[in-house]
Amino acid sequence: MKLTCVLIIAVLFLMDNQLITADYPRDEQVYRAVRLRDAMQKSKGSGSCAYISEPCDILPCCPGLKCNEDFVPICL
């Protein structure tokens, strides 16, 4: 009985992992948050201003943000 339960749970777990990763090619199995972050960075383009929490010592902050120069200059 215990062995049957363990086997059923193992099969369900393996099927679940297969279904989750089936949507993405083998080389692109990365976390959803990483894919979202990369997509957001690509959509920004090269840009000529620093976005929030980016350093503002080289580029000026984008409109609506201020350069906080307390410890490390970053846009807030």
Curated annotation (Swiss-Prot):
Classification via InterPro entries: Conotoxin
Keywords of the record: Disulfide bond, Knottin, Secreted, Signal, Toxin
Record localization: Secreted
Keyword Iron: no
GO molecular function: ion channel inhibitor activity; toxin activity
Paired cysteines (S-S): C49-C62, C56-C67, C61-C75
GO cellular component term of the entry, any: extracellular region
Tissues showing expression: Expressed by the venom duct.
Pfam families hit by this protein: Conotoxin (PF02950)
Main location: secreted
Propeptide segment residues: 23-48
Signal sequence residues: 1-22
Domain remark text: The presence of a 'disulfide through disulfide knot' structurally defines this protein as a knottin.
Family: Belongs to the conotoxin O1 superfamily.
Listed name of the protein: Conotoxin Lt6.1
Lineage summary: Eukaryota, Metazoa, Spiralia, Lophotrochozoa, Mollusca
